[in-house]
A protein has these predicted regions:
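N-terminal acidic leader/helix
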Residues: 1-34
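Short amphipathic beta-strand/extended segments with alternating polar/hydrophobic composition
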Residues: 33-41
Length: 75
């Protein structure tokens, strides 16, 4: 697996990896991580993948991180 691109964001690290016939988009915020997997067949190209990872997708991921932080804090 190798990193092929990243998406700039002020509060998360967003990295795009490629391995065999899949892309993985990894979001990292503090001790939390979320990874989304896409096949090349689904997205066709890196450019198409990056259009799927739009502001709405990123915001939903950020909200999920907030839920994860609360859950971890309350353990």
């Amino acid at each position: 697996m190798r990193i092929i691109d990243s998406i700039p964001h002020e509060s998360m690290t967003i990295s795009i990896f490629q391995m065999n016939d899949k892309y993985q988009v990894r979001f990292e915020a503090g001790p939390m991580e979320q990874t989304f997997k896409f096949t090349l067949e689904e997205v066709k190209s890196l450019e198409n993948l990056k259009t799927k990872i739009n502001a709405e997708f990123i915001e939903a991921t950020r909200k999920r991180f907030n839920e994860m932080f609360v859950q971890m804090r309350d353990i």
